[in-house]
Design a protein with these regions (language model features):
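Catalytic phosphate/metal-binding cores of nucleic-acid and nucleotide-processing enzymes, i.e., regions
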Residues: 1-148
Length: 148
């Protein structure tokens, strides 16, 4: 099974994003979602959200923004199949490691994130806040996921 661990801020939006949720939070750009969709289509990968946006699952304050994000992704044909665990004292890479331990069926994965992911440098595709997910990032992720 192939997985894309998805961060949102700095991946699906960038320094030039001018869209906002109904509550006023910086949102996502359609063209960046389409790049993610191209990656998923080319690799038949499953999306697992590792972004702090997942806190909207349990936090009432962020719930509406979270629902708006999921609806936006779905409108582009991007389905989020799961979420990394929230471990209050853990770095994101520890949460991803825990998810991988709980899902041994995952044999290939990439991590799309603008932050450092120290445990998985070979699978980390580091995006830049300035640009978000680029075509080059997508190509690199496809190579990792489709490697035989």
């Amino acid at each position: 099974m192939k997985v894309v661990f998805l961060d949102v801020d700095g991946v699906l939006n960038n320094d030039y994003t001018k869209t906002y949720t109904k509550s006023g939070a910086e949102f996502v750009d359609d063209y960046l979602i389409e790049r993610l969709k191209a990656l998923i289509t080319a690799t038949d990968a499953t999306v697992i959200m590792s972004s702090s946006w997942r806190y909207g699952l349990t936090c009432a304050r962020h719930h509406d923004d979270f629902v708006e994000l999921i609806e936006k992704l779905e409108s582009h044909g991007v389905h989020v199949s799961g979420y990394t665990p929230t471990m209050n004292t853990a770095h994101k890479s520890v949460e991803i490691k825990q998810y991988l331990l709980e899902h041994p069926e995952i044999d290939k994965f990439v991590i799309l994130d603008d932050d450092e992911i120290e445990l998985f440098p070979e699978q980390h595709i580091e995006t830049l806040n300035r640009y978000g997910l680029t075509d080059e990032n997508v190509e690199e992720a496809i190579k990792i996921l489709n490697k035989h």
